[in-house]
Swiss-Prot record:
Provenance organism: Dictyostelium discoideum
Lineage: Eukaryota, Amoebozoa, Evosea, Eumycetozoa, Dictyostelia
Gene symbol of the encoding locus: enoph1
Free-text function comment from the UniProt entry: Bifunctional enzyme that catalyzes the enolization of 2,3-diketo-5-methylthiopentyl-1-phosphate (DK-MTP-1-P) into the intermediate 2-hydroxy-3-keto-5-methylthiopentenyl-1-phosphate (HK-MTPenyl-1-P), which is then dephosphorylated to form the acireductone 1,2-dihydroxy-3-keto-5-methylthiopentene (DHK-MTPene).
Protein name: Enolase-phosphatase E1
Predominant subcellular localization, coarse grouping: cytoplasm
Superkingdom as given in the UniProt entry: Eukaryota
Cofactor: Mg(2+)
Gene Ontology molecular function terms on file: acireductone synthase activity; magnesium ion binding
Pfam family, one: Hydrolase
Subunit relationships: Monomer.
Family: Belongs to the HAD-like hydrolase superfamily. MasA/MtnC family.
Entry EC no(s): 3.1.3.77
Gene Ontology CC entries for this record: cytoplasm; nucleus
Keyword Ribosomal protein on entry: no
Length: 267
């Protein structure tokens, strides 16, 4: 018998949002506007803090590469922003090299996310960027809210970035529908303990009254191990899931509309 679901936890990339959005819209926006952003914001406390955090990360990487054999980060040097003798243009060039290097290597460091978050906020507010969700997502959110089903987001993107995407979506602000957000500060998405922490934080009944929807079979496996109901999002453009045997042990949908035929949403 299918249990009643009263809490839905959603991934973003490949689930609520085309997986291409981040790589085709958000990341290119950073690359295209990084020089302008740094020059326009130069001297602001926000940018000073962003650069300080990037510099601290560079020092940590440099120290780690010296201490650990064959663990060379090769992170490009950032000049000391607190050294008054540092040439402004050379400092800017070093920051740009470092940021682009991290993005080229798909690094998800906290300082990089912080800078990106500030840039995306500016982009969204000035309508240079608009969040994208699949067409049926707003209706699903509305249906869940009407039936008193709580909606949470759990994504590797920062909570700030999550809120921007849903607040400035192509269907208007969807934030009022969402009760809460989680990112990797609560734990990695491949670890069952992360989902257990989320359950403990929400604290709204037994694990089998929750549904987690994701496009990642490894995330699905981790969530299931923590007791959640899980459904895989199989969307056009998502990376193919190679392990067909494991895939077939999960419910699968290609649209949120299909979730309402597979699960009982009742609170």
């Amino acid at each position: 018998m299918t249990p009643n679901i009263h809490t839905v936890i959603l991934d973003i990339e490949g689930t609520t949002t085309p997986i291409s959005f981040v790589h085709d819209v958000l990341f290119p926006y950073i690359r295209d506007n990084l020089v302008r952003h740094i020059n326009q914001k130069w001297g602001s406390e926000e940018l000073k803090q962003d650069i300080k955090e990037l510099y601290k990360l560079y020092l940590e990487d440099n120290k780690a590469s010296e201490l650990v054999v064959n663990n060379q980060f090769n992170t490009p040097e950032i000049l000391n922003p607190d050294d008054e003798s540092t040439d402004k243009e050379k400092l800017i060039e070093s920051v740009i090299r470092n940021v682009i290097y991290q993005m080229d290597n798909d690094r998800k460091s906290t300082p990089l996310k912080q800078l990106q978050g500030h840039m995306w906020l500016e982009g969204y507010e000035n309508e240079l960027v608009k969040g994208v969700v699949f067409p049926e997502v707003p209706k699903a959110f509305e249906n869940w809210n009407l039936n008193h089903i709580d909606i949470y987001i759990y994504s590797s993107g920062s909570i700030a970035a999550q809120k921007l995407l849903f607040n400035y979506s192509n269907f208007g602000s969807l934030l009022p529908y969402i009760k809460g957000h989680f990112d990797t500060t609560i734990g990695g998405k491949l670890h069952p303990s992360s989902y257990e922490k989320i359950l403990s934080t929400i604290n709204n009944g037994s694990p089998n009254s929750y549904l987690f929807v994701t496009d990642s079979i490894l995330e699905a496996k981790a969530a299931r191990e923590s007791g959640l109901n899980v459904c895989l999002s199989i969307r056009d453009g998502n990376p193919p899931i190679v392990d067909r045997e494991l895939l077939n042990t999960f419910d699968q949908v290609s649209s949120f509309d299909q979730l309402f035929n597979k699960f009982n949403f009742k609170n």
